Amino acid sequence: MAEVAFVLGNGQSRKGIDPNNLKEKGTVFACNAVYRTHQPHWLVAVDPKMMLEIAETDYVVHNKVYSNYNRQYEKHQKLLDHVTWSKPSLGWSSGPTALRLACEQGFKEIYILGFDYQGLAVDANKNRFNLNNIYGHTRNYKRSNDQATFFGNWMNQTKKCLQDFKDVQFHRVIPAGGYQPKGLEWKDNIDHPSTEEFLEKFNLTR
């Protein structure tokens, strides 16, 4: 499969990059509240609160949605009829689940955007980090000034994808000088191009 995949987390670093423009360049896997404004090729949502929000709309009827099954969904026939369920359920966060889905579908080159991991530093000494999510302060999300969740699980789940799919080349797009977790500091099948390099490669603007 020559086509590339784009896997979108919701970290602030991808703000301004339109998923619709990426759909013209490859297959887009995106997460959670993206559904409010866009229709990626695949929407991945594993949090029950987010899935129940999505169930209030007809999004799943007209678009591809991937999730973990939960008994709470038995009252929502639309979800039962139209969602593709992870088998077995990974118990992972949405972003790494989307990344693994792209790998399992056979993509050999995957661009990862919005996987920032680290929160937004509140002070120069970086003693505290606040939520880093473009949907902060909206329904089913923390407030923007809430303390960031520790990213260790997200990073380890990402690393598991890299280890399990060694024939896939991963490109984690970050701002120049952006945060690189020590757990992802190897060169075997991942690199960290800058946002500007990514935009230039695909002839995109933000």
Model feature map: region roles:
Residues 1-206:
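Metal-ion/cofactor- or nucleotide/acyl-coenzyme-handling active-site neighborhoods
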